[in-house]
């Protein structure tokens, strides 16, 4: 190849004109470089030569190329300095406000540089950097976020059914621009937030729906309104769902719900007949956009989970079964009446959708338990005189007029009542009256009430009355000098022994009529000396009986103290008789001596 300088031989005549020499040399240089570029095109073919005009950095249009402008054009076409990336990064997808403002190019749109393209090959030197044609630009890598078609395949059917009121412009844009829907799926804000994708929707969204059929005025077509019932689940803490509900606004679903808002009261469906409650289970009836992820449609949430049935609310008034079916209310239930009543209550019972307690029986009648008015008394109360005679001391109705004191549970009688008992005033109630003098022996011998017996120890009282209990009606009256300590103590011991011996037939006692004379012998002697034998009164602290009183009182206190702390052994007879078994639950010989 000839040197470029050899071409200057024909310019001898034009040596003085520099403005002609320089363009000619530049043209020759471009011709030599064009031959070298043809060899590079064999290894790096280009599909299309893009011709454009260059702009001078100073704003002047250049008819010829310059090295500075060629370098700037190549860098702008290969590196794309001033353009944002076509696909949003994963961090940008978390902020819908940023990803929505970015103008996303379509797949079939040619990427145009803001700078003018390089001129044609006949005027510029091409770059040696390999670059694919812009007209065949396509996306082959996977998206960093989940595709809208996959999210749509897992969207609940109730949420898809609510999108029937979308505008035609939204539908056309969804079908035409598949790449735009791939990046930015349509999200609308509604009451139930059912249009959000599964990974952006809160947990309170519904997974089932109810079709409410309402006939038109002319009997024409039937409108199908699908309402999504929100479940009682906790709200999700997904930040993306909150951002989407705040950034997007779609009032189509709100208008659909507001037309029939009166059918919902406090979160419950009202006036829904049983025939109109249907579950949306037919996947073919729901229109879904065409997508390449058809295999995911078979694994929707409605196919994996089954919605709980909802029983319709009966608007008819409750019928009183006692009025409508008087034959069911019977006094003594029979098998047939019980079966009819059970079927009627089982059919008409209100079974709630959610119950905290699960039981095998819904009412007490199914357990065989009847109401209080239907109960039959199988053990009637005995009203015979014998049953009223032997009663407990705690609820006893004694025959003599008496009164109670706070010191103990035994009843007190007055002196006049005792005189009437001695005179036979109560002979129609009692067969015999026994007066027990609990004073010491020297006191009794000094003076006592007529017909009274002296028993001043516990063992003596038990041997006298409980070894061989009397079978006739007897009234026992205890007294001492003042009836404050010795008489009440011995009388309580006698009552406790009688109760223990009759524990197998409680509340019956051998001697239910036990009284204490109020005021004791001293008061009785002062008022009724003629009823004393001998007519005398010897006090317990008499000077002539000091030693005897001290010894007797020590024995009385010792027995009382030991009996409180002494352990009881079966076989040890408290009656001092080998013929009596003192076990409280044994059927001993004393149990045969009953008063009937």
Swiss-Prot record:
Compartmental location: Cytoplasm; Nucleus
One Pfam family it belongs to: Rhodanese
GO BP annotation list: cell division; G2/M transition of mitotic cell cycle; mitotic G2 cell size control checkpoint signaling; mitotic intra-S DNA damage checkpoint signaling; positive regulation of G2/M transition of mitotic cell cycle; positive regulation of G2/MI transition of meiotic cell cycle; regulation of cell cycle switching, mitotic to meiotic cell cycle; regulation of cell size
Domain Rhodanese: from-to ranges: 429-533
Key words of the record: Cell cycle, Cell division, Cytoplasm, Hydrolase, Mitosis, Nucleus, Phosphoprotein, Protein phosphatase
Phylogenetic classification of the source organism: Eukaryota, Fungi, Dikarya, Ascomycota, Taphrinomycotina
One cellular component term from this protein's GO annotations in UniProt: cytoplasm
EC nos: 3.1.3.48
Catalytic activity: O-phospho-L-tyrosyl-[protein] + H2O = L-tyrosyl-[protein] + phosphate
Record PTM: Phosphorylated by srk1 in the N-terminus; phosphorylation promotes nuclear exclusion.
Subunit structure: Interacts with rad24 during G2 in a srk1-dependent manner; the interaction is increased during osmostress.
Catalytic site positions: 480 (phosphocysteine intermediate)
Chain positions covered by the region annotation Disordered: 174-221
Protein name: M-phase inducer phosphatase
Principal localisation: cytoplasm
GO MF assignments: phosphoprotein phosphatase activity; protein tyrosine phosphatase activity
Residues bearing the modification Phosphoserine: 99, 178
Summary of the function given for this chain in its UniProt record: Tyrosine protein phosphatase which functions as a dosage-dependent inducer of mitotic and meiotic progression. Directly dephosphorylates cdc2 and stimulates its kinase activity. Required for the G2/M transition of the cell cycle. Required for induction of meiosis II.
Organism: Schizosaccharomyces pombe (strain 972 / ATCC 24843) (Fission yeast)
Similarity section: Belongs to the MPI phosphatase family.
């Amino acid at each position: 190849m000839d040197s470029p300088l050899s071409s200057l031989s024909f310019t001898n005549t034009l040596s003085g004109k520099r403005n002609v020499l320089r363009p000619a040399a530049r043209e020759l240089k471009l011709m030599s470089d064009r031959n070298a570029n043809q060899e590079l095109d064999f290894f790096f073919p280009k599909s299309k030569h893009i011709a454009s005009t260059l702009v001078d950095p100073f704003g002047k249009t250049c008819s010829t190329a310059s090295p500075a402008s060629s370098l700037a054009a190549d860098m702008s076409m290969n590196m794309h300095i001033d353009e944002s990336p076509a696909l949003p990064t994963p961090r940008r997808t978390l902020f819908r406000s940023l990803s929505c403002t970015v103008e996303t190019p379509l797949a079939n749109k040619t990427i145009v540089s803001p700078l003018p393209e390089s001129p044609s090959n006949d005027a510029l030197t091409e770059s040696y950097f390999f670059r694919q044609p812009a007209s065949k630009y396509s996306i082959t890598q996977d998206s960093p976020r989940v595709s809208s078609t996959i999210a749509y395949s897992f969207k609940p059917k109730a949420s898809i059914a609510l999108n029937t009121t979308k505008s035609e412009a939204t539908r056309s844009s969804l079908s035409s621009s598949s790449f735009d829907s791939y990046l930015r799926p349509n999200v609308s804000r509604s009451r139930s937030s059912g249009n959000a994708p599964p990974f952006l929707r809160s947990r309170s969204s519904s997974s089932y729906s109810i079709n409410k059929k309402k006939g038109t005025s002319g009997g024409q077509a039937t409108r199908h309104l699908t309402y999504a019932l929100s479940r009682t689940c906790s709200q999700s803490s997904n930040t993306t769902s909150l951002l989407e509900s705040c950034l997007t606004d779609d009032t189509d679903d709100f208008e659909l719900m507001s037309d029939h808002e009166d059918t919902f009261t406090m979160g419950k469906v009202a006036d829904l007949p049983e025939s109109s409650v249907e579950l949306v289970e037919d996947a073919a009836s729901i229109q879904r956009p065409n997508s390449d992820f058809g295999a995911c449609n078979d694994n929707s949430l409605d196919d994996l989970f089954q919605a709980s049935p909802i029983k319709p609310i009966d608007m008819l008034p409750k019928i009183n079964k006692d009025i409508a079916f008087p034959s069911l209310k019977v006094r003594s239930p029979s098998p047939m009446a019980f079966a009819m009543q059970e079927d009627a209550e089982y059919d008409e019972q209100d079974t709630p959708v959610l119950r905290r307690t699960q039981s095998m029986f819904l009412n007490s009648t199914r357990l065989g338990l009847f109401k209080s008015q239907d109960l039959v008394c199988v053990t009637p109360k005995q009203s015979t005189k014998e049953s009223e005679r032997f009663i407990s001391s705690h609820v006893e109705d004694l025959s003599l007029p008496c009164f109670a004191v706070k010191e103990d549970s035994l009843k007190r009688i007055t002196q006049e009542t005792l005189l009437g008992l001695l005179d036979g005033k109560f002979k129609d109630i009692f067969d015999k009256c026994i007066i027990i003098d609990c004073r010491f022996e020297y006191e009794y011998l000094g003076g006592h009430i007529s017909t009274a017996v002296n028993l001043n120890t516990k063992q003596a009282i038990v041997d006298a009355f409980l070894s061989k209990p009397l079978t006739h009606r007897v009234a026992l009256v205890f007294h001492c000098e003042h009836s404050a300590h010795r008489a009440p103590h011995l009388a309580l011991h006698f009552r406790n022994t009688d109760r223990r011996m009759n524990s197998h037939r409680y509340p019956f006692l051998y001697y239910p009529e036990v009284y204490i004379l109020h005021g004791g012998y001293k008061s009785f002697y002062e008022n009724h000396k003629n009823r004393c034998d001998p007519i005398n009164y010897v006090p317990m602290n008499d000077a002539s009986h000091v030693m005897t009183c001290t010894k007797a009182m020590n024995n009385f206190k010792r027995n009382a103290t030991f009996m409180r702390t002494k352990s009881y052994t079966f076989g040890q007879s408290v009656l001092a008789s080998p013929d009596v078994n003192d076990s409280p639950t044994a059927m001993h010989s004393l149990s045969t001596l009953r008063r009937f």
